[in-house]
Amino acid sequence: MSDIVYANVSHYNKIEASKYDNPSTLAISKVISSKILQFEDNSETSLRHDLPKYDQDRLLLTSDDDLTNVNNFWKKSGMSILDFACGTGLISQHLFPYCKQIVGIDVSQDMVDVYNEKFRKMNIPKERACAYVLSLDDLDGNGDEPFSTEFDAVVCSMAYHHIKDLQEVTNKLSKLLKPNGRLFVADLIKGGDTFHGNLHPDEIAKLGVAHHGGFTPQSILNLFKNASLSNAEVIGKAQANVWVDEAKYQRSTQSKDAKTLDLANGEKLYEVKLQLMVISGIKT
């Protein structure tokens, strides 16, 4: 296990997994999922901090919410999806109505446990939605995997900035696609605020943050091109104004005169502005 993978496993432990789903991550996952589903052709969304505070009961498991113009790519029958670095399943929950099967993989057992518990509580069988503690190195196509290793779509949301060798990972994700399948990557845009920008290098290593400043769109497009993915393009951007706790605020590059919000339990939250993008490419 590499140092960066070990750091990610250590950071996303049971405590972190239990509190990972919060109003900010829920709202961000919703807007990223909408970009993935709609292919909004470079349009930009402003995700304001006064969005409704989505809770577990509000998460999409039907396709008739406020999403319109879902791309025809998602209307094919029998779709299979891999959610790489799936975490607690926030993206999977939004994409589930549009597929026959969704598989999540993550290096954190605690994150995977939360993912699977969610879907079991909704009486969705594991044959249709299930996460596994696996890394990309475990998916070698030798038949030992508990699922098919060919997918119509592979998604990776807010994980690339935790990955050291991005080209290697992009190449491997590309190989898991069926012909005409799509890879979707969502992450931070370089130059916007980030939760990791003010960390000392030792702290960055502890958190498993390999590219803490985010990415330029062109840098991700180049990764896709080198992985032989065609028609790579930015399919959506968003500015997300979200509330974070003091620890994340102190790690952020947000100016130190941010808006604050006092909670009833005495905790203070701070507003941080993130710039997000979603990029997609096709395996030909």
Swiss-Prot record:
Any single biological process term in GO: methylation
Keywords in alphabetical order: Cytoplasm, Methyltransferase, Nucleus, Transferase
Gene Ontology CC: one annotated term: mitochondrial inner membrane
Group of enzyme by EC: transferase
Gene Ontology molecular function: methyltransferase activity
Compartments, record wording: Cytoplasm; Nucleus
CDD domains (UniProt xref): AdoMet_MTases (cd02440)
Source domain of life: Eukaryota
EC code(s) of this entry: 2.1.1.-
Function: Probable methyltransferase.
Family: Belongs to the methyltransferase superfamily.
UniProt-recorded name of the protein: Uncharacterized methyltransferase C1347.09
Organism annotation: Schizosaccharomyces pombe (strain 972 / ATCC 24843) (Fission yeast)
Organism taxonomic ancestry: Eukaryota, Fungi, Dikarya, Ascomycota, Taphrinomycotina
